[in-house]
């Protein structure tokens, strides 16, 4: 399980020196590995046991053994051990960590077995945002519309709840955006920052997004939004979406606004 490591010179040393060590317990209650968080500037920040027959990171979640004892059907997905512990210490006893920033499909399926409502609360640095985007897509692919909690001041969950407390965290949880609104707002932000000549080009991002929505009613809501934003007739927009869906997989999968002969009059 990787507590001791052999150096290039053949000597053995403590792999987790200068780190806080956390036992990793699977959902059956068995210790299967260890994680270490650096207490200084040592990189990487988090270090896990190596992959083995008993420890496979992609199949496990830190804190799931505790979560299983709760009756709460919400689950908050965070990055690290300290986030889980801090949230638990403040009464949020339904947090689990993905043992790093990258959620795997197997971890998502494990969450689906136990939770009805999934909240993603990763750090808001570039790596955390990228991991959030990936997690949103993974959950959507298995039929879960997760919600994304965005914490202010760039704080991670550990720092945030220690500074603002449980009620403020729950307030942020209540404001969490579902996956579709989260994705839409990200594209809307890109659109709003584009100059007038570039705005038309951003329509393809909206078309790609709209084509990814399976639920007809949900898609219709966002079609109305995009139709209003670009002053496009909904039937024309639907034509572009259908062309995108038909041609997905081809290299030339963008510029569907042009293929659908959409014309936008700048406002």
Language-model-derived ranges and their functions:
Residues 26-27, 68-74, 102-118, 122-267:
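A charged alpha-helical hairpin associated with nucleic-acid processing machineries
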């Amino acid at each position: 399980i990787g507590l001791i490591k052999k150096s290039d010179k053949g000597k053995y040393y403590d792999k987790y020196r200068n780190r806080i060590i956390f036992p990793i317990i699977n959902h059956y209650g068995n210790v299967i590995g260890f994680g270490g968080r650096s207490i200084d500037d040592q990189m990487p920040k988090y270090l896990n046991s190596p992959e083995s027959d008993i420890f496979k990171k992609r199949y496990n979640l830190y804190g799931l053994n505790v979560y299983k004892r709760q009756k709460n059907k919400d689950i908050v997905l965070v990055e690290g051990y300290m986030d889980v512990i801090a949230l638990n210490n403040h009464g949020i006893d339904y947090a689990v960590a993905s043992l790093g920033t990258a959620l795997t499909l197997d971890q998502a399926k494990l969450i689906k077995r136990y939770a009805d409502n999934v909240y993603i609360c990763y750090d808001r640095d570039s790596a955390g945002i990228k991991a959030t985007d990936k997690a949103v897509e993974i959950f959507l692919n298995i039929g879960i519309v997760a919600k994304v909690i965005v914490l202010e001041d760039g704080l991670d969950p550990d720092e945030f709840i220690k500074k603002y407390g449980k009620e403020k965290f729950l307030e942020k949880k209540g404001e969490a955006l579902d996956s579709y609104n989260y994705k839409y707002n990200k594209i809307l932000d890109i659109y709003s920052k584009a100059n007038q000549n570039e705005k038309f080009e951003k329509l393809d991002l909206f078309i790609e997004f709209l084509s990814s929505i399976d639920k007809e009613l949900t898609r219709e809501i966002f079609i109305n939004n995009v139709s209003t934003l670009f002053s496009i007739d909904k039937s024309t927009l639907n034509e572009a979406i259908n062309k995108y869906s038909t041609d997905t997989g081809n290299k030339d999968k963008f510029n569907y606004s042009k293929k659908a002969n959409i014309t936008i009059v700048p406002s």
